[in-house]
């Protein structure tokens, strides 16, 4: 089993995300093969300025929907202070994982923006083609 390490976001992916999101993403570290994600039983989990992946960053970067879902958590929730560990746990206790407001918001954000990110990535030279299953059924569990 590999141990976690920071992965570089490919330039084409970074450019497309920044164009769509309207802000820089360079301060967000992507950690692949993370024990933290594995401990949480998640494909990915986030914290302030961090996306922790169970698997490879290469696979993550080919999935526009999942990238948007995770970057939404980091940029629109953790970074603004609306998402904290205690708030997330309370939401899960009150509403369950699927219906907690942070997951609902991230799924809606990804649903709304994935087609545009898919197009931006497809139009970018030297980008990997988006993953055919661009919207996983359970996205990521926190």
Put a short name on every predicted segment.
Residues 1-42, 46, 78-142:
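Metalloprotease/metallohydrolase-associated module, dominated by Zn2+-dependent proteases
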Residues 41-44, 50-68, 97-98:
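Short pre-active-site segment immediately N-terminal to the catalytic Zn-binding motif
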Residues 65-77:
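Active-site recognition of the HExxH zinc-binding catalytic motif
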């Amino acid at each position: 089993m590999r141990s976690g390490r920071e992965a570089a976001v490919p330039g084409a992916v970074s450019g497309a995300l920044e164009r769509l999101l309207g802000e820089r993403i360079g301060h967000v570290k992507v950690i692949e093969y993370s024990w933290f994600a594995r401990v949480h039983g998640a494909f990915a989990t986030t914290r302030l300025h961090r996306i922790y992946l169970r698997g490879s960053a290469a696979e993550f970067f080919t999935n526009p929907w999942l990238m948007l879902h995770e970057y939404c958590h980091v940029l629109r929730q953790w970074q603004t202070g609306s998402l904290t560990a205690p708030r997330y746990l309370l939401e899960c206790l009150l509403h369950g994982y699927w219906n907690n407001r942070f997951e609902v918001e991230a799924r809606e954000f990804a649903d709304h923006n994935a087609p545009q990110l898919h197009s931006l990535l497809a139009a970018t030279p030297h980008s990997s083609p988006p993953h055919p299953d661009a919207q996983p059924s359970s996205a990521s569990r926190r």
